[in-house]
């Protein structure tokens, strides 16, 4: 969140981000970068415009997180649940994506796979204990199960 806040306060820096950068804002963090949005459609359109202008990938976190490419493609992730809206969950997402990038996955694939696995781990955690009180470490604990589910 700190890096996104810095970018929001220094918007010119968005154009200096390295190729392959991925931003993972939630709706309010995105609005700090692009201005207030009237509805979710406008928010999505502004995120697409930002991804294109800054030549970055954006994962707009939410009920159905949107993965947006610099070319304007938009993919919606079907996994995840409201219990994942907890401190540290975005850090877990970042860690999953970075692990995929470190293995050589292309940026777009790492963003899509990482978002899916992260959400699936959250869904596994929800089934185990429910949404209320879910914390980031619950998602981490369920990552191996999520990977196993997609490999079967």
What name fits each language-model region?
Residues 1-79:
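Glycine-rich phosphate/dinucleotide-binding loop and adjoining beta-alpha-beta core of small-molecule
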Residues 27, 75-77, 94, 119-122:
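Short acidic (Asp/Glu) and glycine-rich catalytic loops that position anionic groups and cofactors
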Residues 19, 72, 104-105, 129, ...:
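N-terminal loops that bind phosphate or other acidic moieties
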Residues 122-152:
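Charged C-terminal helix
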Residues 95-103, 116-124, 145:
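Short glycine/serine- and small hydrophobic-enriched flexible loop segments
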Residues 80-97, 107, 132:
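Short glycine/threonine-rich catalytic loop with a Thr-x-Gly-x-Asp
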Residues 43-52, 107-121, 136-144:
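Short, well-structured alpha-helical segments that form the helix of a local strand-helix-strand
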